[in-house]
């Protein structure tokens, strides 16, 4: 599951030398994810990375998430509650970067360091740890361009485009597909959700019987799209590329259903998030961006991601 190499990250780079030994029991770091790990392998991997690295460094890690990735108010309330309880550092994947900006400012003003993972925030000077999502989506678009002739009908299943992650993936796919002459017939959001991805794909197929490829901004939506394509008896004519390389998607690739997916490194997002905020808690500094990388997953390597 998510078999990217588990880097020792900042420790390997020498940026946390001696810190594990001085981390104190009362140090508490909150990891606020956009969605719960249960039912979503991506967030489960983020949580595992954060908790395991926290244990290695001797800090308490509390992992929280709103009920859904669109429940902005719940995430804000969770963070405000933890600030009131005296949390020492925050690792944040914001559901809505603009809406979360005030509570991030509040934390920083109170001396509580914050880093962003997975999704960039809007607060100046806060480090982002995660994927270059636009480049990753462009990589996915390139797979489609290499497979299909110019002018082919293609579609994009977007995530939540008010989030920087959703916008970057939508933009990267759009720009890449446009550049190679694909005919983008639909760009619709499935809000990162499998059931919504299925419903949106059904709607797209109704008006586009000659569809040849779809880029799904995450694997959940891609797997939903595959269900719709199966029901329409069109899976054999549509090239499906996802994003995240979660275990279900890897299995789908091996079954010749999903054609490929783009792997992130969610484990390292969680682990490096904890390491990085601990660096700030100890008075250290960070780079503005820490890129956790991407790789194409197809039948040649999908077994490594199950």
Model-predicted segments: where are they?
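Bacterial N-terminal signal peptides
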Residues: 9-20
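A residue-level marker of the well-folded mature domains of exported/periplasmic proteins
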Residues: 3-6, 21-306
